[in-house]
């Protein structure tokens, strides 16, 4: 590591503590979803779906706070991304229970069709 940074007390461990856990997403979803924010949210939803039991039928619960913790997206960024994903048919939502909790489900068939359409348009 740079001696100047170490002289300031900035060690690799300090950087890891400050930077926290990185957030990744599937870049191929950016043109399909219309932006990085929506691509990040859809990527996180796809990742979450992979660990579900078959009986869940693809549905999972996420609170606004959980989305923020997992992705770093603010409430307004989440709402904008969710709206875009719903409109494009890539993500379904439903409210269930009292008090109502928000459930999500990725539509893999719609994601696949959107990826194919984008790939086809890229090679024309």
Predicted features and spans:
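Short recognition helix of helix-turn-helix/winged-helix DNA-binding domains
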Residues: 1-66
